Protein backbone atom coordinates (compact mmCIF):
# COMPACT_ATOMS: atom_id res chain seq x y z
CA UNK A 1 0.00 0.00 0.00
CA UNK A 2 2.77 2.46 0.97
CA UNK A 3 4.69 1.61 -2.21
CA UNK A 4 1.59 2.25 -4.35
CA UNK A 5 0.98 5.62 -2.68
CA UNK A 6 4.64 6.44 -3.40
CA UNK A 7 4.06 5.45 -7.05
CA UNK A 8 1.16 7.94 -7.18
CA UNK A 9 3.18 10.77 -5.64
CA UNK A 10 6.31 10.20 -7.74
CA UNK A 11 4.18 9.65 -10.84
CA UNK A 12 2.27 12.93 -10.53
CA UNK A 13 5.48 14.89 -9.87
CA UNK A 14 7.08 13.38 -12.99
CA UNK A 15 3.96 14.02 -15.09
CA UNK A 16 3.63 17.67 -14.03
CA UNK A 17 7.36 18.41 -14.33
CA UNK A 18 7.57 16.58 -17.64
CA UNK A 19 4.64 18.54 -19.09
CA UNK A 20 6.32 21.80 -18.06
CA UNK A 21 9.65 20.83 -19.64
CA UNK A 22 7.98 19.54 -22.82
CA UNK A 23 6.05 22.80 -23.18
CA UNK A 24 9.20 24.92 -22.67
CA UNK A 25 11.07 22.95 -25.30
CA UNK A 26 8.20 22.97 -27.79
CA UNK A 27 7.66 26.73 -27.40
CA UNK A 28 11.38 27.35 -27.98
CA UNK A 29 11.30 25.28 -31.18
CA UNK A 30 8.12 27.06 -32.35
CA UNK A 31 9.74 30.46 -31.77
CA UNK A 32 12.79 29.43 -33.80
CA UNK A 33 10.40 28.42 -36.61
CA UNK A 34 8.91 31.96 -36.40
CA UNK A 35 5.43 30.80 -35.41
CA UNK A 36 3.16 33.70 -34.30
CA UNK A 37 2.95 34.15 -30.52
CA UNK A 38 -0.84 33.86 -30.56
CA UNK A 39 -0.64 30.48 -32.30
CA UNK A 40 1.98 29.25 -29.81
CA UNK A 41 -0.19 30.34 -26.89
CA UNK A 42 -3.40 28.77 -28.15
CA UNK A 43 -1.87 25.49 -29.30
CA UNK A 44 1.42 24.43 -27.70
CA UNK A 45 1.02 26.18 -24.34
CA UNK A 46 -2.69 25.37 -24.02
CA UNK A 47 -2.14 21.72 -24.90
CA UNK A 48 0.89 21.55 -22.62
CA UNK A 49 -1.23 22.39 -19.57
CA UNK A 50 -3.51 19.45 -20.41
CA UNK A 51 -0.68 16.97 -21.06
CA UNK A 52 -0.97 15.38 -17.59
CA UNK A 53 -4.65 14.53 -18.21
CA UNK A 54 -3.86 13.32 -21.73
CA UNK A 55 -1.00 11.00 -20.76
CA UNK A 56 -2.75 9.57 -17.69
CA UNK A 57 -5.99 8.93 -19.63
CA UNK A 58 -4.20 7.40 -22.62
CA UNK A 59 -2.05 5.10 -20.48
CA UNK A 60 -5.11 4.11 -18.43
CA UNK A 61 -7.12 3.25 -21.54
CA UNK A 62 -4.25 1.25 -23.05
CA UNK A 63 -3.95 -0.72 -19.80
CA UNK A 64 -7.67 -1.51 -19.95
CA UNK A 65 -8.66 0.71 -17.01
CA UNK A 66 -11.08 2.81 -19.06
CA UNK A 67 -13.05 3.99 -16.01
CA UNK A 68 -9.83 5.55 -14.73
CA UNK A 69 -9.27 7.22 -18.11
CA UNK A 70 -12.76 8.72 -18.41
CA UNK A 71 -13.02 9.40 -14.67
CA UNK A 72 -9.85 11.48 -14.91
CA UNK A 73 -11.39 13.72 -17.60
CA UNK A 74 -14.85 14.03 -16.06
CA UNK A 75 -13.38 14.57 -12.60
CA UNK A 76 -10.85 17.14 -13.86
CA UNK A 77 -13.62 19.16 -15.51
CA UNK A 78 -15.73 19.09 -12.34
CA UNK A 79 -12.64 20.02 -10.30
CA UNK A 80 -11.90 22.91 -12.68
CA UNK A 81 -15.38 24.45 -12.77
CA UNK A 82 -16.44 23.94 -9.16
CA UNK A 83 -13.29 24.00 -7.03
CA UNK A 84 -10.83 26.06 -9.06
CA UNK A 85 -13.34 28.73 -10.10
CA UNK A 86 -14.98 28.54 -6.66
CA UNK A 87 -11.80 28.96 -4.63
CA UNK A 88 -10.47 31.64 -7.00
CA UNK A 89 -13.70 33.67 -6.63
CA UNK A 90 -13.53 33.14 -2.88
CA UNK A 91 -10.02 34.65 -2.87
CA UNK A 92 -11.11 37.61 -5.04
CA UNK A 93 -14.28 38.24 -7.09
CA UNK A 94 -13.64 37.15 -10.68
CA UNK A 95 -14.29 39.46 -13.63
CA UNK A 96 -15.38 37.42 -16.66
CA UNK A 97 -14.50 38.47 -20.20
CA UNK A 98 -17.51 38.87 -22.50
CA UNK A 99 -15.92 36.50 -25.01
CA UNK A 100 -15.74 33.85 -22.28
CA UNK A 101 -19.46 34.20 -21.51
CA UNK A 102 -20.49 34.25 -25.17
CA UNK A 103 -18.14 31.61 -26.59
CA UNK A 104 -15.95 29.64 -24.16
CA UNK A 105 -18.55 28.68 -21.54
CA UNK A 106 -21.28 27.76 -24.07
CA UNK A 107 -18.81 25.60 -26.02
CA UNK A 108 -17.62 23.91 -22.81
CA UNK A 109 -21.27 23.26 -21.93
CA UNK A 110 -21.93 21.92 -25.45
CA UNK A 111 -18.94 19.56 -25.21
CA UNK A 112 -20.12 18.30 -21.80
CA UNK A 113 -23.64 17.60 -23.08
CA UNK A 114 -22.30 15.81 -26.17
CA UNK A 115 -20.15 13.55 -23.97
CA UNK A 116 -23.09 12.79 -21.68
CA UNK A 117 -25.25 11.78 -24.67
CA UNK A 118 -22.48 9.60 -26.11
CA UNK A 119 -22.07 7.80 -22.78
CA UNK A 120 -25.76 6.87 -22.48
CA UNK A 121 -25.02 3.45 -24.01
CA UNK A 122 -22.05 2.90 -21.68
CA UNK A 123 -19.45 3.11 -24.43
CA UNK A 124 -17.25 5.61 -26.22
CA UNK A 125 -16.78 4.03 -29.65
CA UNK A 126 -14.25 5.00 -32.29
CA UNK A 127 -17.06 6.81 -34.13
CA UNK A 128 -17.94 8.77 -30.98
CA UNK A 129 -14.29 9.64 -30.43
CA UNK A 130 -13.87 10.66 -34.06
CA UNK A 131 -16.81 13.06 -33.76
CA UNK A 132 -15.30 14.57 -30.61
CA UNK A 133 -11.96 15.13 -32.32
CA UNK A 134 -13.57 16.73 -35.40
CA UNK A 135 -15.42 19.12 -33.05
CA UNK A 136 -12.07 19.92 -31.42
CA UNK A 137 -10.58 20.83 -34.81
CA UNK A 138 -13.56 23.11 -35.48
CA UNK A 139 -13.11 24.74 -32.06
CA UNK A 140 -9.39 25.31 -32.67
CA UNK A 141 -10.05 26.79 -36.13
CA UNK A 142 -12.63 29.25 -34.80
CA UNK A 143 -10.45 30.15 -31.80
CA UNK A 144 -7.28 30.69 -33.85
CA UNK A 145 -9.15 32.69 -36.49
CA UNK A 146 -10.70 34.95 -33.86
CA UNK A 147 -7.42 35.36 -31.98
CA UNK A 148 -5.49 36.17 -35.18
CA UNK A 149 -8.01 38.91 -36.02
CA UNK A 150 -7.59 40.41 -32.53
CA UNK A 151 -3.80 40.21 -32.83
CA UNK A 152 -3.85 42.00 -36.21
CA UNK A 153 -6.05 44.76 -34.77
CA UNK A 154 -3.76 45.15 -31.75
CA UNK A 155 -0.47 45.18 -33.64
CA UNK A 156 -1.86 47.74 -36.08
CA UNK A 157 -2.41 50.18 -33.20
CA UNK A 158 0.68 49.56 -31.08
CA UNK A 159 4.42 49.79 -31.54
CA UNK A 160 6.33 46.50 -31.57
CA UNK A 161 8.04 45.68 -28.31
CA UNK A 162 11.50 44.15 -28.41
CA UNK A 163 11.62 40.80 -26.68
CA UNK A 164 14.62 40.89 -24.34
CA UNK A 165 14.23 37.30 -23.20
CA UNK A 166 17.24 35.25 -24.21
CA UNK A 167 16.13 32.46 -26.58
CA UNK A 168 16.73 28.86 -25.55
CA UNK A 169 19.52 27.07 -27.40
CA UNK A 170 18.29 24.63 -30.07
CA UNK A 171 20.05 21.65 -28.49
CA UNK A 172 18.56 22.43 -25.07
CA UNK A 173 15.03 22.71 -26.44
CA UNK A 174 15.37 19.26 -28.04
CA UNK A 175 16.73 17.85 -24.77
CA UNK A 176 13.77 19.28 -22.83
CA UNK A 177 11.30 17.80 -25.33
CA UNK A 178 12.87 14.35 -25.00
CA UNK A 179 13.20 14.57 -21.19
CA UNK A 180 9.64 15.91 -20.90
CA UNK A 181 8.19 13.08 -22.97
CA UNK A 182 10.15 10.48 -21.00
CA UNK A 183 8.90 11.89 -17.68
CA UNK A 184 5.31 12.06 -18.97
CA UNK A 185 5.33 8.45 -20.14
CA UNK A 186 7.17 7.07 -17.10
CA UNK A 187 5.21 9.17 -14.62
CA UNK A 188 1.86 8.26 -16.20
CA UNK A 189 2.66 4.55 -15.95
CA UNK A 190 3.67 4.88 -12.29
CA UNK A 191 0.62 7.02 -11.51
CA UNK A 192 -1.87 4.65 -13.16
CA UNK A 193 -0.23 1.57 -11.63
CA UNK A 194 -0.31 3.08 -8.14
CA UNK A 195 -3.88 4.39 -8.47
CA UNK A 196 -5.16 1.02 -9.72
CA UNK A 197 -3.53 -0.89 -6.86
CA UNK A 198 -4.77 1.59 -4.25
CA UNK A 199 -8.32 1.22 -5.61
CA UNK A 200 -8.06 -2.56 -5.28
CA UNK A 201 -6.59 -2.31 -1.77
CA UNK A 202 -9.22 0.02 -0.27
CA UNK A 203 -12.10 -1.59 -2.15
CA UNK A 204 -13.32 1.31 -4.28
CA UNK A 205 -13.85 1.40 -8.02
CA UNK A 206 -11.32 2.71 -10.51
CA UNK A 207 -13.94 5.28 -11.51
CA UNK A 208 -13.97 6.80 -8.01
CA UNK A 209 -10.16 6.94 -7.94
CA UNK A 210 -10.18 8.58 -11.36
CA UNK A 211 -12.84 11.12 -10.36
CA UNK A 212 -11.03 12.09 -7.15
CA UNK A 213 -7.30 11.36 -6.66
CA UNK A 214 -6.28 11.21 -10.32
CA UNK A 215 -8.42 14.19 -11.39
CA UNK A 216 -7.28 16.30 -8.46
CA UNK A 217 -3.63 15.45 -9.00
CA UNK A 218 -3.61 16.33 -12.69
CA UNK A 219 -5.53 19.59 -12.03
CA UNK A 220 -3.26 20.96 -9.28
CA UNK A 221 -1.29 23.28 -11.64
CA UNK A 222 -4.52 24.93 -12.84
CA UNK A 223 -5.64 25.44 -9.23
CA UNK A 224 -2.39 27.12 -8.20
CA UNK A 225 -2.24 29.28 -11.34
CA UNK A 226 -5.87 30.40 -11.08
CA UNK A 227 -5.66 31.34 -7.40
CA UNK A 228 -2.50 33.38 -8.02
CA UNK A 229 -4.14 35.04 -11.05
CA UNK A 230 -7.21 35.91 -8.97
CA UNK A 231 -5.03 37.53 -6.29
CA UNK A 232 -3.26 39.59 -8.98
CA UNK A 233 -6.52 40.68 -10.62
CA UNK A 234 -6.09 38.57 -13.77
CA UNK A 235 -9.03 36.26 -13.11
CA UNK A 236 -10.64 36.85 -16.50
CA UNK A 237 -7.76 35.17 -18.30
CA UNK A 238 -7.59 32.41 -15.68
CA UNK A 239 -11.23 31.34 -16.04
CA UNK A 240 -10.90 31.38 -19.82
CA UNK A 241 -7.92 29.02 -19.58
CA UNK A 242 -9.77 26.70 -17.18
CA UNK A 243 -12.78 26.42 -19.50
CA UNK A 244 -10.52 26.01 -22.52
CA UNK A 245 -8.86 23.15 -20.67
CA UNK A 246 -12.29 21.55 -20.14
CA UNK A 247 -13.02 21.68 -23.87
CA UNK A 248 -9.59 20.22 -24.68
CA UNK A 249 -10.07 17.44 -22.10
CA UNK A 250 -13.34 16.24 -23.64
CA UNK A 251 -12.86 16.83 -27.35
CA UNK A 252 -9.13 16.27 -27.84
CA UNK A 253 -8.09 13.88 -25.08
CA UNK A 254 -11.13 11.58 -25.15
CA UNK A 255 -11.23 12.01 -28.94
CA UNK A 256 -7.67 10.79 -29.46
CA UNK A 257 -7.82 8.17 -26.70
CA UNK A 258 -11.13 6.76 -27.96
CA UNK A 259 -9.89 6.50 -31.54
CA UNK A 260 -6.85 4.53 -30.36
CA UNK A 261 -8.85 2.27 -28.05
CA UNK A 262 -12.67 2.29 -27.66
CA UNK A 263 -13.76 2.63 -24.03
CA UNK A 264 -16.42 0.69 -22.13
CA UNK A 265 -17.72 2.46 -19.04
CA UNK A 266 -18.77 0.62 -15.90
CA UNK A 267 -18.23 2.88 -12.90
CA UNK A 268 -18.87 6.29 -14.52
CA UNK A 269 -22.52 7.10 -13.77
CA UNK A 270 -25.06 9.62 -15.03
CA UNK A 271 -24.55 11.44 -11.72
CA UNK A 272 -20.90 12.10 -12.61
CA UNK A 273 -21.63 13.19 -16.17
CA UNK A 274 -24.62 15.29 -15.09
CA UNK A 275 -22.50 17.00 -12.42
CA UNK A 276 -20.00 17.95 -15.13
CA UNK A 277 -22.82 19.56 -17.14
CA UNK A 278 -24.44 21.23 -14.11
CA UNK A 279 -21.13 22.66 -12.86
CA UNK A 280 -20.50 24.33 -16.24
CA UNK A 281 -24.09 25.61 -16.33
CA UNK A 282 -23.70 27.10 -12.83
CA UNK A 283 -20.56 29.00 -13.82
CA UNK A 284 -22.36 30.29 -16.92
CA UNK A 285 -25.40 31.46 -14.93
CA UNK A 286 -23.23 33.15 -12.28
CA UNK A 287 -21.17 34.92 -14.95
CA UNK A 288 -24.24 36.83 -16.18
CA UNK A 289 -24.33 38.90 -12.97
CA UNK A 290 -22.41 41.94 -14.27
CA UNK A 291 -19.87 39.59 -15.88
CA UNK A 292 -18.51 38.69 -12.46
CA UNK A 293 -18.45 35.72 -10.12
CA UNK A 294 -18.85 37.11 -6.61
CA UNK A 295 -17.38 35.63 -3.42
CA UNK A 296 -20.74 34.16 -2.35
CA UNK A 297 -21.07 32.48 -5.76
CA UNK A 298 -17.58 31.06 -5.36
CA UNK A 299 -18.59 29.69 -1.96
CA UNK A 300 -21.67 28.06 -3.54
CA UNK A 301 -19.51 26.38 -6.19
CA UNK A 302 -17.10 25.11 -3.52
CA UNK A 303 -19.94 23.74 -1.37
CA UNK A 304 -21.44 21.94 -4.39
CA UNK A 305 -18.04 20.35 -5.06
CA UNK A 306 -17.68 19.19 -1.45
CA UNK A 307 -21.22 17.79 -1.53
CA UNK A 308 -20.46 15.86 -4.71
CA UNK A 309 -17.27 14.42 -3.20
CA UNK A 310 -19.20 13.27 -0.12
CA UNK A 311 -21.85 11.55 -2.27
CA UNK A 312 -19.18 10.00 -4.48
CA UNK A 313 -17.15 8.55 -1.62
CA UNK A 314 -20.05 7.35 0.51
Region locations from a protein language model:
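Hydrophobic alpha-helical segments, chiefly the membrane-spanning helices
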Residues: 1-314
Amino acid sequence: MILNVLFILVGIVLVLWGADRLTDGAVAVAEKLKMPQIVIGLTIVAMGTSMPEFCVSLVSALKGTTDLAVGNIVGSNIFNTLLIVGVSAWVAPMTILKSTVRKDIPFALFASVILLIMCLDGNISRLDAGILFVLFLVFMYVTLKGAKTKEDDTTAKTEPIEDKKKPMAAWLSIVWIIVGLACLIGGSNLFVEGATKVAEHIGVSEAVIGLTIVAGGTSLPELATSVVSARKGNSGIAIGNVLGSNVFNILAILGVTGVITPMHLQGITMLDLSMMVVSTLLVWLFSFTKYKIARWEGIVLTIVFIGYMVVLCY
